[in-house]
Amino acid sequence: MPVWKLIKYASLLIIVVTLPAACGTSKTLTVASTATLLEDVAKASFKQSDLKLVREGMPSYLMLIDGMVEAVPENKQLLITAAQSYASYASGFIQDEDKAYALTLYAKARSYALRALEQNGFKNPLSRPFDDFEDGLQKMAQKDLPYLFWAASCWGGWISLNQGSMEAMAELPRVVAMMKRVLELDEAFYYGGAHLFMGILEASTPRIAGGDLNLARAHFLKAIELGEGKFLMAKVYFADYYAKKAFDRELFIATLEDVLGTPADIEVELTLLNSVAHSKARKLIAEADDYF
């Protein structure tokens, strides 16, 4: 079913959900059906290559998912889907042109992701003492990976756009600890996403503050390897964060040209993200003279 039809059908179900229910069981079934449908919309969107279509449809989808969370606020799968959706919209379509709005979107993603983490059993991630926080991470297992990874990813995205806030930066050690736990549990999870995060972190941190460019390179290359070269955003970030920092124009251009030479649908479920990677790669190449 096309994305726009899925959204239209989901809209009708949202209306039903929010009307006073004569039968509690009926409402529960409708909520469950809509939650499943919204996940289907997300999956269908990630197979799209039409960035304009997805960009224009996302605000409606986000409003729908907000309505669903309002109806079933303790559904952890719905919460994590909402977090992923807000973070993906911010990073893929908004961040490069409107950082203030992207920060607002990431704040929503962070809120949903932390709520999902709590519903999954990890209580008070913001306020519990750090030693207790780390002990809690050690109790998390493979089954907890989606909640752990996406909470850390959304939280980290919010911090990256909020670096002027000392309070936000003080939360970074918690995110790093979460990503390190992801690496311990399964370094290949989400195309080596934790390695990608650590690569960006090491490359972005000044050497005087402990950043290690060689370690950043190792993390980026491991992420690319674990994604079998199909997750093109890993290569875009490698060029943007490592090659630029290393002042290696040849590597910068070669990496981005490799991205553009790889079909977006090399992995169907990554078509949208790879199309975004193509767009970002073209922009970075056009701006190369500004960096080197």
Regions found by a protein language model. Give the residues of each.
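Bacterial Sec signal peptide processing site at the extreme N-terminus
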Residues: L19-S45
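Extracytoplasmic and endomembrane cell-envelope/extracellular-matrix remodeling and assembly machinery
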Residues: A286-F292
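Membrane-interfacial loop-to-helix junctions in multi-pass transporters
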Residues: E187-A188
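Bacterial N-terminal signal peptides
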Residues: A10-P20
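Domain-scale activation on soluble regions of proteins
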Residues: G227-E228, I285
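A short, ordered amphipathic alpha-helix with a cationic face
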Residues: K5, P20, L53-R55
